[in-house]
């Protein structure tokens, strides 16, 4: 595999980068933090996606800060095909989380996978390794220089087995073990099912089902014969019953017809009687109507004579009377209208007369009011003039009392008083301000004295408390010293116990390493013990089979004698191998027992070491506590000194404040006396000013009142003049009202005469209309009587026709009665006396017989159904018996098959175990050779002879004198060399094909800062190591380093730089 191209956007410190990889050795250099390792991480992430991230490093950390999306496009060549992986990521600023938004794998330009998980699986399948195996084989990350060294043997075994594809064999062995367990479970279930089926078969056969079925079938045949005979009897009874039913039905029909005929005769007779009755009613009604007709004729003749209608036809008479009534009604209406107009005119005149009288009264009232208002105005004028005279006299008295002459003198005096009052007020305010400042200063001094007293009291309390704290802390220090001595004695006892167990104080630091080594040895012995036990079981099985064959003497296949053959020799070799393995197994068990004792001793030593550690912690805590107490004592003493100095300065300050306060008291007393005198003078000035202003205000008010009264007098004189004009107008108006009243009264008298004449005319017209209306009503009544006479005549003719129809009906009913009576006699002649009862008795006997036969058939049928049900159950049992026998045979075959499968799975599991152990041994041997070869090539110091890699992947370094040493106990530089050698050895082993891969299918080697712990000599050896890896077929080697020698020897060199302003990295080829 070779990397071809890397295109990234917004990954770590790279905003955008398009980088092409070259064959050979490529060195990437740059200052710390420039983004070299980020470039390798981008390649790693391009291959395996987010699977490379650890728990402390999330996907969002890979995206450039502030970016919302990122891309990685990685192109590579593998086994002759061109591949391209496109990864895209999306970052949410809101949730601050990132996710994979696109993951596509192209092969030779064709899209083969387009989902993150599937792409990851496809890449793992292509490379035959996942991200962890890639790190352990080809990618040595910065900070993971000794991962394989520090790993536990079990983890190291898993890592290397996965790289060499041995983990598949372990997986297959586990699958075979699971299959064996499952087959054993199925075999047990099949055996239980076999026993259950067998027990069920025996239970069914014990009931003799075939004989029982034959007996029941014979009983069914007998029951069928009885049912056939009963069904014949039932059919005969049913036939006889049917005949009787028909005869009885016919008899009943005839009886029913006779009854119907009799009812019809009775109905005809009733209808005939009803017709006779109705005929008589019609005859009586004809006589009544004829009497009414005669009365109406006589009434019409009387009306004609009374009203003078003569022999005129009723229509002409009605027309004449209607015209007369209409003419009279029109005369009444015209008279009523004329009368209404006259009445309305009279009402209008009366209303106008009333309005004139009302206006006259109102005018007279206004006239009286005007005369009254003129008198009142004259009285007000006299009052106003009296008030003016009184106010003028009051003003004169006020001026004489105050000693003022003109109004100008009053204003000048008030101005002088105001200026004097202002000067006195300013003086009073000045004295009050000085007094306020003095009082405030006195209050501030008193507050300062109180604060000083409080502060001095706090200092005294703090000094007392500090001395108490110092005494308590000194006592605590003495107690801590005593406790430290006690813990040191207990610690000495613990070290004595450790010495008794054989551990020195210097060995306590390595107890965990000893414990881990012992546990690893224990696990290794346990695994070896299990392998030996499996091998011993296989040998015993082989011996048992060989002994059985030897006991028979001949080969069961070819018949050849087995004595002295290869089987006999193999049996002897197996016996010897068994004895040897048994001794080895016993030796391993002894070693395990010895390890258990060592582990117990180590466990006790760890307990004691923990106690000693706890005592050290307690002693350290007590010493720290003592130091803290001493610091507190020093602090308290310093504070006591500070508080004492503070007390002294506060005392001096208090004396100064008290002296200043005494002086202020004298000043305040003098200022209060000055303030009192100023207030007295100011009050007298204010009083004089107020009295002057009162005089001035009173004079001004009186002048204003006089002016107001003069205005009112002028107003009253104007009102009197207006009222005089109004009186003239009202007198003229009263004269006009008198003339209008006289004219209205004359007009009303003329209307009264006209109204009397109109009322007489209306009364005469009404009388004439009443008479014409009466005659019209008589004519209409005559018309109604004539119409009623016509209706009566029509009714009489209808009644006479009805009487004829009823006579015909009566003849029809007589004929009907005769015909039905003849039919009844014929039907009664066909009946045979009282034979119906006899037929009914026979029918009852046949019905009873039919019911009995049916009940017996039902009972026998139920018995037959029971027999058939039993037969069905037994037949089901026979069918079940057949099925169970087939199932029993199948279960037997299944059990034998599962037993064979179990044996095959057991043999397969053992085979996988042997193959894995064999392949692991071969790989370990090859890896050990390569490891020592490269270690001797790489390591320039001659302090170590070789490295041992045991079957459990435990690594041990041996010194020249043969002393073994754990790799983790090597120095940092030695561990770095050891790690490089181990990684390169694994890579070489994979290149040789032990893992099943072709050499050109391996990924490029990537070394991130491999020279961190190496000196100059080992750096030169690293260059040779890189050349060696190139010689075995590694097409690409990518190194991140600052070392100049690596840079000089590289085929391609790139420089990575980061812009400090934008924090973005860039790469250039050198």
From Swiss-Prot:
Q: Which residues bind Zn(2+)?
A: 555, 558
What exactly does this protein do? Answer: Part of the Rad50/Mre11 complex, which is involved in the early steps of DNA double-strand break (DSB) repair. The complex may facilitate opening of the processed DNA ends to aid in the recruitment of HerA and NurA. Rad50 controls the balance between DNA end bridging and DNA resection via ATP-dependent structural rearrangements of the Rad50/Mre11 complex.
The protein's name: DNA double-strand break repair Rad50 ATPase
Where the record annotates domain Zinc-hook, the positions are 508-607
Write out the entry's keywords from A to Z.
ATP-binding, Coiled coil, DNA damage, DNA repair, Hydrolase, Metal-binding, Nucleotide-binding, Zinc
The entry's family comment says: Belongs to the SMC family. RAD50 subfamily.
**What Pfam families has UniProt attached to this entry?**
AAA_23
Gene source species: Methanosarcina mazei (strain ATCC BAA-159 / DSM 3647 / Goe1 / Go1 / JCM 11833 / OCM 88) (Methanosarcina frisia)
Please state the gene responsible for encoding this protein. Answer: rad50
GO MF assignments: ATP binding; ATP hydrolysis activity; zinc ion binding
Q: Which residues form a coiled coil?
A: 227-257, 369-403, 449-478, 570-614, 878-908
Q: Which GO terms describe its biological process?
A: double-strand break repair
Question: Assembly state and interactors?
Answer: Homodimer. Forms a heterotetramer composed of two Mre11 subunits and two Rad50 subunits.
Instruction: Give the note describing cofactor binding and stoichiometry.
Output: Binds 1 zinc ion per homodimer.
Positions with a binding annotation for ATP: 12, 32-38, 142, 969-974
